[in-house]
């Protein structure tokens, strides 16, 4: 591997570790890192989805192991999210549109997450509500299409919605978004099959890097991080990634 590929492998390891700790797979971080390295959207999208798929699979397995996945909370978002993500995966945005759109969405999500983390009421344990089916179906479909179009997996957008609507605790949200990421990344990668030939030759090494980082992060997030810290860390990650894509 050349110096740039090694540097990205290290960056991907750190990104996967940090994101997996909060139930995310890191697609927005991978996208930001590759965009800053000069990769085209045609290569960024399938690569980010492949890396996202690896980490979300590890995260899902870890959350299943500790019994934190509630399928009642997952399937309403996935029913329409999966096909919508596959449809979005087949859509290719030009670079001048791709980066600002994704960056803006991430910044808005970060602000909402930060407000939730800093409010005293957000740190008080409350009984979460079960997501209403119709609302979850619409949310899953919209986020699925947007995430498929941008190559971001979707969990990074779904988490703020779940927490804001009190549809789950911080740990339940992390578990739900890990599964949602896995399903939507798979669907979007299938939808983006036309750009598979743009995948970098270094992808296998990057997959190993994110697998290692994701394993460590998922273990930390599922067992050791408090609910308030999960919110704070996720908001910071969202803001940094969004600002990098905007500027």
Swiss-Prot record:
One of its GO terms (cellular component) is plasma membrane. Keywords: Cell membrane, Membrane, Plasmid, Transmembrane, Transmembrane helix, Transport. The chain crosses the membrane at residues 5-25, 31-51, 74-94, 121-141, 202-222, 227-247. It is a multi-pass membrane protein. It is found in: Cell membrane. Belongs to the 4-toluene sulfonate uptake permease (TSUP) (TC 2.A.102) family. PANTHER family: MEMBRANE TRANSPORTER PROTEIN MJ0441-RELATED, MEMBRANE TRANSPORTER PROTEIN-RELATED. This is Probable membrane transporter protein y4hK.
């Amino acid at each position: 591997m050349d110096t740039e590929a090694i540097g990205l492998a290290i960056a991907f390891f750190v990104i996967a570790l940090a994101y997996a700790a909060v139930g995310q797979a890191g697609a927005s971080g991978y996208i930001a890192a590759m965009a800053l390295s000069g990769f085209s959207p045609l290569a960024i999208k399938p690569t980010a989805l492949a890396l996202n798929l690896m980490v979300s699979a590890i995260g899902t397995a870890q959350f299943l192991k500790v019994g934190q996945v509630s399928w009642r909370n997952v399937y309403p978002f996935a029913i329409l999210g999966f096909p919508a993500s596959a449809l979005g995966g087949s859509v290719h945005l030009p670079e001048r549109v791709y980066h600002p759109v994704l960056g803006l969405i991430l910044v808005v999500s970060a602000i909402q997450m930060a407000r939730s983390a800093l409010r005293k009421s957000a740190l008080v344990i409350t009984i979460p509500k079960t997501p209403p089916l119709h609302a979850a179906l619409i949310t899953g479909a919209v986020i699925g299409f947007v995430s498929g179009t941008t190559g971001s997996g979707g969990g990074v957008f779904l988490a703020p919605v779940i927490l804001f609507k009190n549809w789950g605790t911080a740990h339940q949200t992390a578990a739900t978004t890990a599964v949602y990421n896995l399903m939507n990344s798979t669907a979007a990668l299938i939808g983006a099959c036309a750009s598979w030939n743009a995948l970098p030759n270094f992808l296998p090494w990057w997959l190993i890097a994110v697998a290692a980082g994701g394993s460590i992060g998922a273990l930390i997030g599922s067992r050791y991080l408090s609910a308030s810290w999960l919110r704070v860390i996720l908001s910071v990650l969202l803001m940094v990634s969004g600002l990098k894509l905007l500027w």
